[in-house]
């Protein structure tokens, strides 16, 4: 199992970080504003960001358009969103999470985690794909930081 994990400190309280993140999941335009490789997003079952709800997302990863469905597994207010890919991607990507840790009144650490099931052959042949995935996750965090720390 490979774990992709990236953390970034953001000068904003957890509720502001989570609020910004929640807005990204509300419309295609907001989702696209988060990262240039994001294409589309919509809720296809349940209420937005409620446990058990299903979201459909399109984004470019390693140069290829991926059409993905995720189930929201766990929500901890102002702290965590855990979600899992649905079949067939669940065979390769069994878990993902966004975690926000408070670092005082006006600071948080945002951590994005994605798990990948991969054997030795993929690790050897899929090095570029793994590097692109790491870059994408890192850029998402940097874009949150930039949006929340930039003067309005």
Where are these regions (language model features)?
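Short strand-connecting beta-turns/loops that link adjacent beta-strands
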Residues: 13, 77-78, 103-107
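Hydrophobic pocket/interface hotspot
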Residues: 17-24, 31, 55-57, 72, ...
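Hydrophobic ligand-binding cavity/cleft-lining segments
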Residues: 1-45
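Glycine-rich portal/gate segments that line the openings of hydrophobic small-molecule binding cavities
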Residues: 40-88, 139-152
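Well-ordered beta-strand positions
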Residues: 9, 73-74, 101-102
């Amino acid at each position: 199992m490979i774990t992709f994990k990236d953390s970034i400190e953001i000068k904003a309280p957890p509720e502001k970080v989570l609020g910004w993140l929640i807005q990204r999941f509300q419309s295609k335009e907001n989702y696209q504003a988060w990262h240039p490789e994001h294409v589309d997003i919509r809720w296809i079952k349940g209420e937005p960001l409620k446990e058990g709800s299903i979201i459909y997302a399109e984004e470019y990863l390693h140069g290829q358009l991926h059409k993905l469905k995720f189930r929201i597994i766990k929500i901890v207010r102002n702290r965590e969103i855990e979600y899992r890919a649905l079949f067939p991607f669940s065979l390769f990507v069994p878990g993902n999470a966004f975690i926000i840790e408070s670092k005082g009144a006006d600071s948080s650490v945002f951590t994005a985690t994605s798990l990948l099931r991969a054997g030795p052959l993929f690790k050897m042949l899929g090095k570029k794909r793994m590097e692109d995935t790491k870059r994408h996750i890192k850029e998402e965090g940097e874009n949150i930081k930039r949006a929340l720390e930039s003067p309005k």
